[in-house]
């Protein structure tokens, strides 16, 4: 007979999660997650992302007082498409080519949580929207490891994965935390044109092209960002594209929702520089790119022209 832990993992795989792991929230891990976050915040590396200092991020029991286990799941989103080499087009980060990953992953998590709830198990789930250190729990649950560029790398799919977290009041058998396999490699640090990876495992959002093109709401970019965009209009994949794990282990996803929507890989810079509210709604309504508002789209495009 299968244990409840294996039964839950099998159900997660049946629903379509490519990886699933479990961690115990009540043991002392040796990853310095709390002090690392505190140091990152005190250095100002969060820029204006004020939600990053939510106290719940330091103590997961504040999200569920009776928590007994943390389940982390991952979905592979890689497709082999490539950006246009034509300089008139701006580049979009791979994560945003398809349907909004929040919706895709949330649908699967809701099915998973409903199945658990029907067995009397309490759950709370998050998809990049709550005060949870998803990457930390992914490493603790054996799903992957936090790399030098701050992304989670899995042995099976590289770093092209979306993460979801389920908190539960059921005590389950934990997986072994994942070891780090970056070794002495520093390709991600060396490729970054703005030196946003200030040292291994620490990213200064203020210098990150992805942060600036997606989260930065200011009217203009600092010169060190503007001069190094190199066509990036929404996000940046440079530190992932050079990663040896991605070059070797990227696998095409079996989730059709993650395949590129028409025109989402590369965008005409002149068109985007004159984007209207109606065009924005029509083009990005089903995409995670809708997080970038019209004014920011125009700014991003003009900075590349």
From Swiss-Prot:
Residues bound to [4Fe-4S] cluster 2: 192, 208, 236, 239
Domain 4Fe-4S ferredoxin-type, residue spans: 170-202
Residues forming the catalytic site: 128 (proton donor)
Annotated GO biological process: queuosine biosynthetic process; tRNA modification
Cofactor: cob(II)alamin; [4Fe-4S] cluster
GO molecular function: 4 iron, 4 sulfur cluster binding; epoxyqueuosine reductase activity; metal ion binding
Main location: cytoplasm
Catalytic activity entry: epoxyqueuosine(34) in tRNA + AH2 = queuosine(34) in tRNA + A + H2O
Function, in words: Catalyzes the conversion of epoxyqueuosine (oQ) to queuosine (Q), which is a hypermodified base found in the wobble positions of tRNA(Asp), tRNA(Asn), tRNA(His) and tRNA(Tyr).
Protein name, entry field: Epoxyqueuosine reductase
Organism taxonomic ancestry: Bacteria, Bacillati, Cyanobacteriota, Cyanophyceae, Oscillatoriophycideae
């Amino acid at each position: 007979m299968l244990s409840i832990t294996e039964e839950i993992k099998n159900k997660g795989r049946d629903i379509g999660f490519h990886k699933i792991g479990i961690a115990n929230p009540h043991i002392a891990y040796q990853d310095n997650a709390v002090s690392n976050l505190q140091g990152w915040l005190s250095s100002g590396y969060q820029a204006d992302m004020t939600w990053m200092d939510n106290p719940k991020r330091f103590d997961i029991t504040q999200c569920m007082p009776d928590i007994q286990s943390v389940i982390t799941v991952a979905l592979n989103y890689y497709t082999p498409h490539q950006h246009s080499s034509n300089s008139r087009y701006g580049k979009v980060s791979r994560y945003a080519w398809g349907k909004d990953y929040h919706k895709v992953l949330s649908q699967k998590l809701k099915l998973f949580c409903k199945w658990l709830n029907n067995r009397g198990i309490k759950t709370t789930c998050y998809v990049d929207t709550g005060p949870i250190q998803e990457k930390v729990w992914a490493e603790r649950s054996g799903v992957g490891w936090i790399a030098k560029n701050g992304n989670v790398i899995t042995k099976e799919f590289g770093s092209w994965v979306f993460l979801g977290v389920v908190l539960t009041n059921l005590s389950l058998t934990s997986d072994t935390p994942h070891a780090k396999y970056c070794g002495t490699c520093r390709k991600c640090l060396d490729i970054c044109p703005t030196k946003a990876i200030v040292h291994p495992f620490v990213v200064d959002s203020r210098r990150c092209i992805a942060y600036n093109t997606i989260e930065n709401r200011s009217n203009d970019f600092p010169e060190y960002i503007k001069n190094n965009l190199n066509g990036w209009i929404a996000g940046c994949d440079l530190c992932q594209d050079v990663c040896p794990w991605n070059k070797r282990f990227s696998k095409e996803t079996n989730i059709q929702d993650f395949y590129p929507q028409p025109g989402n890989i590369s965008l005409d810079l002149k068109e985007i520089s004159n984007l209207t509210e109606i065009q924005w709604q029509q083009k990005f309504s089903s995409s995670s790119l809708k997080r970038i508002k019209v004014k920011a789209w125009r700014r991003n495009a003009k900075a590349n022209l």
